[in-house]
Amino acid sequence: MPASPLRFIRQDIQSMHAYAIQASDGMVKLDAMENPFTLPAALQAALGQRLGAVAVNRYPGQRIEDLKQALAQHIDLPPGYALMLGNGSDELIALLAMACDMPGATILAPEPGFVMYAMSARLQGLNFVGVPLAANFALDEAAMQAAIALHQPALVYLAYPNNPTANLWDAQVMRRLIAQVGAYGGLVVVDEAYQPFSSGTWLDEIRRDLSAHSHVFLMRTLSKF
């Protein structure tokens, strides 16, 4: 009898479930933060013509640096910060988990939150700690502080606004948690994938106090631009 083709696949990976997308028939679909409108016909034609002239058969070379420079100008990137681009937030989240893959390392996030925080940690063999939100969907500051003190996570995710609860965290609580993580050398990711739905951005806070955010990544997405 031949050996199982799954023998070298970790058991915890085999026990995981696929990332499921719920049907949205008859609903106003906002959960994926997609642009509900198609491009105007004139823009479609111009875009097709422009893309048709791009040497897609070659690696991007300098084009990636040109794109980074344009994006940095667009968002008025604070001094001392740099941009890292990925194929959607999922790739960046996975790369961060890989970068933090040290024995006993932990990734922490409030829950409910974006499923990929936990999934990327588990795929990489890291510990994941989810901290339940308060009854009003606010951050449970005491529980977050206790979990951070206990586990000293390499990486803490704070979605701003949160997905799926749609709220912005209290700024004072955010500042205290960011400072707590920075005190032992941990990293914080402020995930602003849904920022276009929001009245605020943590980028303003970063600009206001750069020194307090030297260990903070701010993540956004163009997948729904």
Provide a role label for each language-model segment.
Residues 79-83, 104-106, 192, 214-215:
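Short acidic capping loops at alpha-helix termini that bridge into adjacent secondary structure
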Residues 33-36, 89-90, 114, 160-165, ...:
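Short glycine-rich anion-binding loops that position phosphate/pyrophosphate groups of nucleotides
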Residues 28-30, 108, 129, 189, ...:
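Hydrophobic/aromatic beta-strand patches that form the interior of the parallel beta-sheet core
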Residues 99-158:
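PLP-dependent aminotransferase-like
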Residues 88-99, 190-194, 198-199:
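Glycine/small-residue-rich loop that forms an oxyanion/phosphate-binding "nest" at active or ligand-binding sites
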Residues 45, 49, 73, 98, ...:
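Short, well-ordered alpha-helices that flank and scaffold nucleotide-derived cofactor binding pockets
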Residues 122, 139-151, 164-188, 192-225:
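Active-site pre-lysine segment of PLP-dependent enzymes
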Residues 2-90, 95:
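N-terminal small-domain helix-loop-helix segment of the aminotransferase-like
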